Amino acid sequence: MVIRSKEQPVVPLGALATTGAIILAARSMKRGEKLRTQVYFRYRVVFQLITLVALVAGGVMMQQESAEQKKTREDKLREKAKQREKLWIEELERRDALIQERKRRLEESRAELKKMAEEGFKQENDNSKGK
């Protein structure tokens, strides 16, 4: 209620003015002052009309603001999605670099083992021939 009152301050003021007009009309009716009673009831109608106009105008303004808020919210969500996508791509690139490094080291290890095996076979062959 307090939040709505801050968003549309004219509506609660109109409601208070309408209530005041009704109270004054009731008091003047109790005293038998017919003319004043009529005047207060006319004030009540005017205050209710002002309150209603303020309520409708506030609703229209809130709709426009909420459309703008929705647009900014969608923009923020798009930006957040772009950031997530960028982070994901960076993570994939990092993982790919690790995989490529592992493959390179594996190939180096294989080449080294193959070289060592060939040297070992050569030594065995040389030792066999030398006997």
From Swiss-Prot:
> Where does this one sit in the cell?
Mitochondrion membrane
Alphabetically sorted, this entry's keywords are:
Coiled coil, Membrane, Mitochondrion, Transmembrane, Transmembrane helix
Gene Ontology annotations for the cellular component aspect, listed alphabetically = mitochondrial inner membrane; respiratory chain complex
Q: Name one GO biological process term.
A: regulation of proton transport
Taxonomy, superkingdom: Eukaryota
- Residue ranges spanning the membrane: these are 10-27, 40-62
Specify whether Transmembrane helix is a keyword of the entry. Answer: yes
The record's listing under InterPro entries reads: Hypoxia_induced_domain, RCF1
Coiled-coil spans are: 62-120
Reported function: Cytochrome c oxidase subunit which plays a role in assembly of respiratory supercomplexes.
Q: Which PANTHER family match?
A: HIG1 DOMAIN FAMILY MEMBER 1A, HYPOXIA-INDUCBILE GENE 1 HIG1 -RELATED
- Designated name of the protein: Respiratory supercomplex factor 1, mitochondrial
